[in-house]
Amino acid sequence: MLNIGCHLSSSKGFKNMGENALKIGANTFQFFTRNPRGSKAKDIDENDVKEFLELAKENNFCKILAHAPYTLNACSADERNREFAIEIMADDLKRMEYLPNNLYNFHPGSHVKQGTEVGIEYISSALNSILKKDQTTKVLLETMSGKGTEVGRNFEEIAEIIKRVELKEHVGVCLDTCHIHDAGYDIVNELDKVLEEFNSIIGLDKLDAIHLNDSKNPFESHKDRHETIGNGYIGLEAVTNIINHPKLCHLPFFLETPNELEGYKNEIELLKSAYKK
């Protein structure tokens, strides 16, 4: 079975997201934990969560993926911004325990001319202060495209962050196809080679989710602009190879393409028809 979903609005709660996922043929979804700008999160509606968990069990949902606000920067030069990122992420993880055994994804951040080494140290330090031994949520570092001073632009930087985290069992990676294509990893022509490199540097056992996006920009452009599946520089053939690859096909795939629900439904149908497992 292809485990696939897309980014959904959380404005009407978890049950609503689950129902919308089913309407478009998905068995998972991604959502923002709060406003993308990081404002106060809505109170947890325990009845809504209960109804969603029942729906998810009845329909064989795989793990869902919570996404931290884009504006968080755990390696900012401003100490207040770093503290804010830690505060929000810690609160998000506390709330995620209402939906146990799922995934939480965040962008590592930008070091803003402090240097990559400083950025890596701040990010790993933030994770060490946030992660708890008894948590059930796995925190995923997202692979980035390398625009500006982003940390996580290559596998080595992600690996170094993980190396410095104490509770490594609670940390994994979300691989974004648009991001790594734009960062200079040739998933179109050399997917096996890219995965071998990932495995040797980070370890495929640390790969827990994939953001499945085409790219509006050419290879190694360091731009990060998502395109609908098959209409960008990655293309449908390469995406088909990704979802069918024996080292990837078991993972949950999350579409973040520029679409409304109907567009996501069409993409999911297309990808299911291309899935050969």
UniProtKB/Swiss-Prot annotation:
<protein>
    <recommendedName>
        <fullName>Probable endonuclease 4</fullName>
        <ecNumber>3.1.21.2</ecNumber>
    </recommendedName>
</protein>
<dbReference type="GO" id="GO:0003677">
    <property type="term" value="F:DNA binding"/>
</dbReference>
<dbReference type="GO" id="GO:0006284">
    <property type="term" value="P:base-excision repair"/>
</dbReference>
<dbReference type="GO" id="GO:0008081">
    <property type="term" value="F:phosphoric diester hydrolase activity"/>
</dbReference>
<feature type="binding site">
    <location>
        <position position="67"/>
    </location>
    <ligand>
        <name>Zn(2+) 1</name>
    </ligand>
</feature>
<feature type="binding site">
    <location>
        <position position="224"/>
    </location>
    <ligand>
        <name>Zn(2+) 3</name>
    </ligand>
</feature>
<keyword id="KW-0255">Endonuclease</keyword>
<dbReference type="GO" id="GO:0008270">
    <property type="term" value="F:zinc ion binding"/>
</dbReference>
<feature type="binding site">
    <location>
        <position position="211"/>
    </location>
    <ligand>
        <name>Zn(2+) 2</name>
    </ligand>
</feature>
<feature type="binding site">
    <location>
        <position position="256"/>
    </location>
    <ligand>
        <name>Zn(2+) 2</name>
    </ligand>
</feature>
<dbReference type="GO" id="GO:0008833">
    <property type="term" value="F:deoxyribonuclease IV (phage-T4-induced) activity"/>
</dbReference>
<feature type="binding site">
    <location>
        <position position="142"/>
    </location>
    <ligand>
        <name>Zn(2+) 1</name>
    </ligand>
</feature>
<dbReference type="InterPro" id="IPR001719">
    <property type="entry name" value="AP_endonuc_2"/>
</dbReference>
<keyword id="KW-0540">Nuclease</keyword>
<keyword id="KW-0378">Hydrolase</keyword>
<feature type="binding site">
    <location>
        <position position="176"/>
    </location>
    <ligand>
        <name>Zn(2+) 2</name>
    </ligand>
</feature>
<keyword id="KW-0234">DNA repair</keyword>
<keyword id="KW-0227">DNA damage</keyword>
<comment type="function">
    <text>Endonuclease IV plays a role in DNA repair. It cleaves phosphodiester bonds at apurinic or apyrimidinic (AP) sites, generating a 3'-hydroxyl group and a 5'-terminal sugar phosphate.</text>
</comment>
<feature type="binding site">
    <location>
        <position position="226"/>
    </location>
    <ligand>
        <name>Zn(2+) 3</name>
    </ligand>
</feature>
<feature type="binding site">
    <location>
        <position position="107"/>
    </location>
    <ligand>
        <name>Zn(2+) 1</name>
    </ligand>
</feature>
<keyword id="KW-0862">Zinc</keyword>
<keyword id="KW-0479">Metal-binding</keyword>
<dbReference type="Pfam" id="PF01261">
    <property type="entry name" value="AP_endonuc_2"/>
</dbReference>
<dbReference type="InterPro" id="IPR013022">
    <property type="entry name" value="Xyl_isomerase-like_TIM-brl"/>
</dbReference>
<comment type="similarity">
    <text>Belongs to the AP endonuclease 2 family.</text>
</comment>
<dbReference type="InterPro" id="IPR018246">
    <property type="entry name" value="AP_endonuc_F2_Zn_BS"/>
</dbReference>
<dbReference type="InterPro" id="IPR036237">
    <property type="entry name" value="Xyl_isomerase-like_sf"/>
</dbReference>
<dbReference type="GO" id="GO:0003906">
    <property type="term" value="F:DNA-(apurinic or apyrimidinic site) endonuclease activity"/>
</dbReference>
<feature type="binding site">
    <location>
        <position position="142"/>
    </location>
    <ligand>
        <name>Zn(2+) 2</name>
    </ligand>
</feature>
<feature type="binding site">
    <location>
        <position position="179"/>
    </location>
    <ligand>
        <name>Zn(2+) 3</name>
    </ligand>
</feature>
